[in-house]
């Protein structure tokens, strides 16, 4: 099995699941046991500053950035927060995903946002998308998703609403011309 960790999943236009329709998911982990990722294009209507106020973090700095919106990371564990960010070594509960990205689940990264200790680029998400053993592989075989290597520019410098379109454009072909049926001529 080839791991798709550090790849983006792009929902096929035929995916009519209201939660995942036109979603782009960054895969943080993919192994024999399953997969875990964060949707990177669904703001929840709360910005990071408001989230930090709700968490009663007194020591935060106001954040002004394209990624200042909190995102729905997925349907699982929506009470749990994740910060996907460029590497910074000082936080607890950080996992290095690639040379360019880390995932942190501790509060200390949140208090750094907006300060000089903050990661250069970040996404804050609540919840995650999860797949059991071989579930993602089956969904890929069923043409539910397409995958591409992670694209830092798309993830951090493209507005949320345009990320699905930009991801599909990066494929190099018109996604609307693909069949949703696998293996049929």
UniProtKB/Swiss-Prot annotation:
This is UPF0301 protein Shew_1144. One of its GO terms (cellular component) is cytosol. Pfam families: DUF179. Gene3D superfamilies: VC0467-like (3.40.1740.10). Belongs to the UPF0301 (AlgH) family. PANTHER family: UNCHARACTERIZED PROTEIN YQGE, UPF0301 PROTEIN YQGE.
